[in-house]
Amino acid sequence: MGKLMVPKILVTNDDGVYSTGLKAAFDSVSDLGEVTISAPAVQQSGVGRSISIFEPLRITKTDVGGIPAYAVGGTPTDSVILGVFTILKAMPDLVLSGFNIGENISTDTITTSGTIGGALEAASYGVPAIAASMQVLDEGQKFDDPRDYQRERFEAGIKVVNRIARNVLKRGMPENVDLLNINIPFHAEEDTPIEITRLARKIFKTDVEERRDPRGRPYYWIAGDLIREEEEGTDVHAIMQKGHVSITPISLDSTARIDFSEIERYL
């Protein structure tokens, strides 16, 4: 009999290698294969799919709650690239990015979230990818030390991700799906309903706050209130209005699904 192949799973995040969310992500797939952690050494939220091309990168061996891990001095995308081409030296069977402390919903986050950015990088190699995020009720928690976030908040999410990851490893991704974006509501339990959703347009009402330093010179904070009401069927509605788990299938191909002759009028 041939030797049974053990799936290789790469885990990353954007909150940094020491986040409790990363350990929860590891726990969610630890029984599914050989798991390797390659994640940013420090907080990298909001960097999207950015890549480091103007400076060298370093890898430091460390541990996450007793689990061996690699801390990368770069972005989540850098962590995936080094994880695949330097640490594993092979394509994994699955990449899991998360758990992010804070929901990643709407088109706002698809291009800005480092959690999703790392998953998109993996998907670009044809590797099935999952991004997993936990809703927070206090927006300030997104900016607190991710090492201090309560581990028990991830229990329901761990079960959801385990089930989905198991099926992805078994069946592969559906046709034309490159990434599954999973968001877990704050009060999720084992029997919380799961919705397959589409992306809402926005999650933030973008605003800019101007302040003055002690010398009277202006500086600025990008800010904005959360949008909590969106159309039925969107990820924002599922999380914010219903308290349901949201799973959004994402494709790398962002080409508008239109008749291309519509564009010829502009030529």
UniProtKB/Swiss-Prot annotation:
GO cellular component, one term: cytoplasm
Main location: cytoplasm
Cofactor requirements of the protein: a divalent metal cation
PANTHER family in the record: 5'-NUCLEOTIDASE SURE, PHOSPHATASE, PUTATIVE (AFU_ORTHOLOGUE AFUA_4G01070)-RELATED
Name this polypeptide is given: 5'-nucleotidase SurE
Organism: Methanosarcina mazei (strain ATCC BAA-159 / DSM 3647 / Goe1 / Go1 / JCM 11833 / OCM 88) (Methanosarcina frisia)
EC number: 3.1.3.5
Stated family: Belongs to the SurE nucleotidase family.
Keyword tags: Cytoplasm, Hydrolase, Metal-binding, Nucleotide-binding
Annotated compartments: Cytoplasm
Domain of life: Archaea
Gene3D superfamilies, sorted: Survival protein SurE-like phosphatase/nucleotidase
Segments traversing the membrane: none
The keyword Metal-binding is assigned to this record: yes
Function: Nucleotidase that shows phosphatase activity on nucleoside 5'-monophosphates.
Keyword Transcription regulation on entry: no
Cofactor binding summary note: Binds 1 divalent metal cation per subunit.
Binding site for a divalent metal cation: 14-15, 45, 100
Catalytic activity reported: a ribonucleoside 5'-phosphate + H2O = a ribonucleoside + phosphate
Alphabetical list of Pfam families matching this protein: SurE
A molecular-function term among this protein's GO annotations: 5'-nucleotidase activity
